[in-house]
Amino acid sequence: MSLLDTLQRGLADLDAQGLRRVRRIADTACDARMTVNGREIVGFASNDYLGLAAHPALVAAFAEGAQRYGSGSGGSHLLGGHSRAHARLEDELAGFAGGFSDAPRALYFSTGYMANLAAMTALAGKGATIFSDALNHASLIDGMRLSRANVQVYPHADTAALAALLDASEAETKLIVSDTVFSMDGDVAPLAELVALAERHGAWLVVDDAHGFGVLGPQGRGALAAAALRSPHLVYVGTLGKAAGVAGAFVIAHETVIEWLIQRARSYIFTTAAPPAVAHAVSASLKVIAGDEGDARRAHLAALIERTRALLRNTRWQPVDSHTAVQPLVIGSNDATLAAMRALDAHGLWVPAIRPPTVPAGTSRLRVSLSAAHSFDDFARLEAALIEASEAAA
């Protein structure tokens, strides 16, 4: 059988299981109301939690950065591509989100995937043991595989099981790895307990705050700040394409850890740096996030979250107990979830169906992603359509 035959058979299998993914094409900027595939829709699919992706100040900063630095970086960070905009942003990020460390330093990456690969592969290797939450993001899992470290997976958020694994470990280097906000459930990791376990066992804790940075904590400083945690054993990863509304990611840790990543993280060294204009726009985003406007947007988002939690409890399906902008509604089968998605789409609402392998088999779900850009009128449309779809499925 040829490769094409094998691939075609695999695609047919995906179709039969209701698992083929289809891209939609946005014709306008990411916002609550968009034109997608030529239709006006209200989107509940993006990770633009603060509604900053089309913010005029960020758009202007992006254009200003392109005028000043050009359209591309021209090289890797170590070979000519590291601009003043990148360096300034790293200093700003360390000051903004590095309060957990006495000597924080930040390192900017082009994507969150690359940042997580860097943390896993450069900090762990043969002889090390990584203790991973069962629901960690795919980028962390891929990084663990590439690291060649021993990986032990503990049940989701089960700190007792994690403690038992740590007690039994004789590894010299131990890394506990966890998302902060889990992207498909919306729940928050038991961070205080994880920090305590790391310190008790001489381990390091690596947290991926992709869905918390900009939203959680005072001024949006993230999940660690929300829990008022400080520790010399922390490595903090955050992304800049979700609440921050631009692109890229970062790692913040003790300055020695960051210097090691610069020297040894292959996903940092062997790739072209992101355009400086992107970093320039992120600097503008941080000003909005940390200011009064950021506080107002987080307050509006919090109100939407509470309304959505109440709404999901009134459907026939199973809501997940989430207090974040990620509001899942577990339906079960792939076909039923796709049918619910199509019913909402008929009302001009884009609420994506999340299916295996992203979530376990039998737990396919709608994932309502909320944004400060949503109005209460947008929520009312979602409420009416979701109740109708739920009743029709009964």
Curated annotation (Swiss-Prot):
Keywords: Biotin biosynthesis, Pyridoxal phosphate, Transferase. The keyword ATP-binding does not apply. Homodimer. Pyridoxal 5'-phosphate binds at residues 112-113, 183, 211, 239. This is 8-amino-7-oxononanoate synthase. It catalyses: 6-carboxyhexanoyl-[ACP] + L-alanine + H(+) = (8S)-8-amino-7-oxononanoate + holo-[ACP] + CO2. The keyword Transferase applies. One of its GO terms (molecular function) is 8-amino-7-oxononanoate synthase activity. Substrate binds at residues 21, 137, 358. It is an enzyme of class 2 (transferase). Pathway: Cofactor biosynthesis; biotin biosynthesis. Catalyzes the decarboxylative condensation of pimeloyl-[acyl-carrier protein] and L-alanine to produce 8-amino-7-oxononanoate (AON), [acyl-carrier protein], and carbon dioxide. GO terms for biological process: biotin biosynthetic process. Coiled coil: none annotated. Its cofactor is pyridoxal 5'-phosphate. Belongs to the class-II pyridoxal-phosphate-dependent aminotransferase family. BioF subfamily. It comes from Burkholderia cenocepacia (strain ATCC BAA-245 / DSM 16553 / LMG 16656 / NCTC 13227 / J2315 / CF5610) (Burkholderia cepacia (strain J2315)). The gene is bioF. The modification N6-(pyridoxal phosphate)lysine is found at residue 242. Its EC number is 2.3.1.47. Pfam families: Aminotran_1_2 (PF00155). It comes from the Bacteria.
